[in-house]
Amino acid sequence: MRVLVNISYQGSQFLGFQIQQHGRTIQQQFEKILKRMHKHEVRIHPSSRTDRGVHAIEQYFHFDTELNIPEQQWQYAMNRALPDDIYVNDVSFVNDDFHCRYDCVGKSYRYKIYQSAHKDPFLCGLKTYVPEQLDIEKMNMAAQHFIGTHDFTGFCSQKTEVESKIRTLYESRIEKTESGFDYIVTGSGFLYNMVRVLIAFLIEVGKGKREPQEVPQLLEARDRNQVPFTAPAEGLYLEKIYLTPNELIQDFGNNIKIHQKKSSQNL
């Protein structure tokens, strides 16, 4: 039986999702619980492997089990054993050929930034502090250039190991908030550090150090050295996982060009 789990977590005190030899991770927390319940190792498979310090409002993983436990009991058992910075929102049974990673057709991230005269220690780990006044209109102009299908080689970590760096973004915009602004970006998939590089560049645009019209040339150049910035992990939230094309159509309309994954290229 294949079990699908919807979770949220506050990532400040985790070394990321993926299990590490030493240190606290999301995968380690769940596999420890599942091993105790099954009396043997159980591997979980996430929709996204978030990095150290990154949060998730919505994240999914699946695992296989021989235990005959109702969905609500799975949720209750895991929440009872989990620490306070992780929560299981929902548990459901899925077909045995469903795969959390390869059936995922889209992801949405939100990067939160606050602006004030002084740093707020109570927001440490939850939002990124930018003291300068920024030109939100110019940032939005630049953000729009990222929408569509592009090679994002120049906007990801040089450690990115996947062969194809072509991704499709359905949404890329700045949203003003009471304390600052958020960057919302939705796409078929994202490269290593891609969202953090995108927002770091947009902040430079907001400061007047870069221009919106540079984006097409930078995408064409595919040179990471021309965009040598990466924003901190603390402001980044995995906000939504799209597991079906209908979910994307509901949010972005019938004309959206949906990329079916079923491969390791669109991480």
Curated annotation (Swiss-Prot):
The record's listing under InterPro entries reads: PsdUridine_synth_cat_dom_sf, PsdUridine_synth_TruA, PsdUridine_synth_TruA_a/b_dom, PsdUridine_synth_TruA_C, TruA/RsuA/RluB/E/F_N
The EC designation for this entry is 5.4.99.12
Q: What residues form the catalytic site here?
A: 51
Residues annotated as binding substrate are 109
Residues forming coiled coils: none
Q: Does the keyword Isomerase apply?
A: yes
Q: Name one GO molecular function term.
A: RNA binding
What UniProt keywords apply to this chain's record, in alphabetical order?
A: Isomerase, tRNA processing
* Catalysed reaction, written as an equation: uridine(38/39/40) in tRNA = pseudouridine(38/39/40) in tRNA
Any Pfam family = PseudoU_synth_1
GO terms in the biological process aspect are: tRNA pseudouridine synthesis
Top-level taxon: Bacteria
Q: Which of the seven top EC classes does this enzyme belong to? A: isomerase
What is the recorded function of this protein according to its Swiss-Prot or TrEMBL entry? Formation of pseudouridine at positions 38, 39 and 40 in the anticodon stem and loop of transfer RNAs.
Subunit composition and interactions: Homodimer.
| Family designation | Belongs to the tRNA pseudouridine synthase TruA family.
Protein's recorded name: tRNA pseudouridine synthase A
Say which species the protein is native to. Staphylococcus saprophyticus subsp. saprophyticus (strain ATCC 15305 / DSM 20229 / NCIMB 8711 / NCTC 7292 / S-41)
